[in-house]
């Protein structure tokens, strides 16, 4: 059984050895909850990686957003290159959930776009967990508490191959279809297979390569890994497991049984609506569910099939759904990163989902069973989380209570860097004062973060700085995950010097080039100016040797005073350690590529964000398009889709948008044919 093998160019220093020893001992002794209170830049991720190596248990790293999950995924990939480090986040590039607003009688239909690459990574994560390996780390967002397929059904459809084993080729093909692989001899894509005589090529749903199985009569003659483009052999196997192409596995028998139960519940709910005087809702529900059942009978699926998931998996009403945590063995560890944010987020997921579904059920859009397609309740998550390490620079009361006083502090940074100096300055003329500070930093090729209280103020401040020739960008809630990563990379690369934001400059952002953090209206008590928020924001300057934070305020609030006192306490401890060990603070130097998953050569991107003509001529501009047959149009649409996906992978969103628009226009033309 493979063990975790940590690879790093450095060894634990400062507080790290003690923190690693305490956390390891706690996990091995079965302590249910511990807290790692680590300051920004103290190497919390490296500490956790050492703990994982010591305990050798499958581990779930839970982060509160995709950007930080991607950052952690890249770091753990580099620490454990020889082990299974997987990534599990929502696979939607865009998701508009189904909803009904009674006040305006507005029904909003579900709309989504699935990211094929992330779908592959999700399948790779579940496949690694069910392989029986112990050396598995899964980095996840809160998607891990959302409903998914039954792990037992997924495992039952695993196909085990062995060279020399007797297996009829046609039986093998039927098993592939049962595992939701599709035969396509012309265009082999992920999740498909093709047959050429005695050779079967399978494009595994969780891999970038093909698996080639060669038969000699009814015997497996060879099992090989093949490059999908060059068809060169990459390796051979004596044994191999093929995991299903989809996380949501069902059988014909379970589908037939589910349809019968759904129709029974439909008649009960329709009768209920008629009894309470809601004939319109009864009619709507009957028509919608009847149509869905016809679609499932004919095609095997329907829009919104997840709302019937309870029937397919034989769950009782009100029981919790299966989720990623069910794929882990019983003896596993959960590490909750930035726990002061992640824990409340886990707690809030169920309530938000239930409020939306309640209207859909009450007004006849969905059966009551739709309520069981949901994220875990917080109590259900607690029951599954048998051993947890909470990681935060500012742990909340919940984590401290759960840990029952077991708090491991990590204050010393391996680089010798100190917590930033905090200055409080009056808010009068704060913008002019800040501009002087910014100019000083720009001369030293350093970066600046500015946090405001409102989105409007962030926009106006950005415009003001730009008018004064200060290269500025601002980040807000409308910026999607990939673009946010690109903005961070651009800041680090020096394409602009100042980043302005509201509540998006706090937890986990790894920006060593930032030497100044300016907090405007620091004395306005509230969520954005609480003790924890201020401490996290100040911490963004802690990775730079010249780190400094300026709070613009007319009075010192309790939250400000707590932040200043705690920062000074840590700074004093760090100074003392540096003096005792003869350490001179060193600037952190990190590669500018944020993750293995979301990476691009930033130099390849144009400075402008304008919508430009692509190098290739847009297909819909060609007059010959109007005379194409349906088949020709479909091929052109598929080509545009692939080009769009390739551009998105390179983070070239402008070109991707062009191909998307081209594809949508051609789809409109196809409808008219």
Regions found by a protein language model. Name each.
Residues 1-5, 440, 576-658, 663-673:
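Acidic, low-complexity intrinsically disordered tails
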Residues 1-590, 597:
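ASCE RecA-like P-loop NTPase motor cores
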């Amino acid at each position: 059984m493979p063990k975790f093998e940590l690879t790093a160019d450095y060894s634990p220093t400062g507080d790290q050895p003690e923190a690693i020893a305490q956390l390891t001992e706690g996990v091995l002794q079965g302590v249910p909850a511990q807290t790692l209170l680590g300051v920004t830049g103290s190497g919390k991720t490296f500490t956790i990686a050492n703990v994982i190596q010591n305990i050798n248990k499958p581990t779930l790293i839970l982060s509160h957003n995709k950007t930080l999950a991607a950052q952690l995924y890249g770091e753990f990939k580099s620490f454990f290159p020889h082990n299974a480090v997987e990534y599990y986040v929502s696979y939607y590039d865009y998701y508009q959930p189904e909803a009904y607003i009674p006040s305006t009688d507005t029904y909003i239909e579900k709309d989504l776009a699935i990211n094929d690459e992330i779908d592959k990574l999700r399948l790779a994560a579940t496949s690694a967990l069910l392989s029986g390996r112990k050396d598995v780390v899964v980095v996840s967002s809160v998607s891990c508490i959302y409903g998914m397929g039954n792990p037992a059904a997924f495992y039952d459809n695993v196909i085990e191959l062995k060279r020399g084993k007797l297996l009829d080729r046609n039986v093998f093909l039927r098993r592939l279809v049962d595992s939701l692989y599709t035969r396509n001899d012309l265009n082999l894509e992920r999740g498909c297979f093709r047959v050429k005589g005695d050779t079967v090529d399978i494009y595994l749903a969780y891999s970038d390569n093909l698996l080639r199985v060669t038969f000699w009569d009814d015997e497996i003659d060879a099992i090989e890994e093949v490059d999908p483009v060059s068809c060169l052999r990459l390796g051979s196997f004596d044994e191999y497991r093929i995991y299903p192409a989809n996380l949501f596995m069902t059988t014909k028998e379970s589908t037939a049984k589910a349809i019968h139960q759904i129709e029974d519940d439909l008649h009960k709910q329709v009768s209920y609506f008629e009894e309470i005087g809601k004939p319109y809702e009864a009619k709507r529900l009957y028509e919608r569910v009847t149509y869905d059942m016809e679609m499932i009978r004919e095609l095997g699926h329907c829009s919104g099939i997840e709302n019937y998931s309870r029937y397919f998996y034989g769950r009782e009403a009100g029981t919790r759904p299966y989720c990623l945590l069910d794929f882990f063995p019983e003896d596993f560890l959960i590490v909750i990163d930035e726990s002061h944010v992640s824990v409340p987020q886990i707690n809030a997921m169920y309530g938000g989902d239930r409020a939306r579904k309640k209207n859909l059920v009450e007004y006849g859009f969905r059966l009551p069973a739709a309520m069981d397609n949901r994220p875990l309740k917080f109590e259900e998550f607690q029951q599954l989380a048998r051993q947890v390490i909470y990681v935060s620079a500012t742990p909340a009361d919940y984590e401290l209570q759960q840990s029952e006083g077991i708090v491991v502090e990590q204050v010393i940074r391996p680089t010798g860097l100190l917590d930033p100096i905090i200055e409080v300055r009056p808010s009068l003329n704060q913008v002019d004062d800040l501009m002087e500070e910014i100019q000083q930093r720009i001369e030293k090729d350093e970066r600046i973060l500015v946090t405001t209280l409102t989105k409007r103020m962030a926009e106006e401040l950005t415009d003001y700085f730009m008018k004064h020739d200060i290269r500025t960008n601002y980040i807000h809630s409308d910026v999607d995950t990939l673009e946010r990563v690109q903005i961070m990379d651009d800041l680090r690369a020096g394409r602009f010097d100042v980043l302005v934001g509201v509540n998006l400059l706090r937890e986990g952002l790894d920006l060593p080039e930032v030497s100044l953090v300016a907090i405007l209206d620091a004395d306005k008590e509230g969520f954005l100016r609480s003790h924890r928020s201020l401490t996290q924001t100040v911490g963004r300057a802690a990775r730079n040797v010249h780190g400094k934070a300026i709070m613009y305020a007319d009075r010192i609030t309790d939250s400000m005073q707590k932040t200043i006192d705690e920062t000074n306490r840590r700074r004093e401890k760090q100074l003392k350690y540096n003096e005792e060990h003869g350490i001179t603070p060193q600037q952190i130097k990190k590669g500018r590529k944020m993750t293995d998953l979301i990476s691009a050569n930033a130099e390849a991107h144009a400075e402008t964000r304008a919508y430009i003509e692509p190098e290739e001529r847009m297909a819909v501009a060609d007059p010959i398009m109007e005379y194409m047959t349906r088949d020709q149009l479909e091929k052109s649409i598929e080509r545009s889709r692939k080009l769009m996906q390739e551009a998105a992978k390179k983070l070239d969103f402008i070109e991707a948008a062009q191909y998307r628009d081209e594809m949508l226009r051609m789809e409109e033309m196809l409808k008219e044919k």
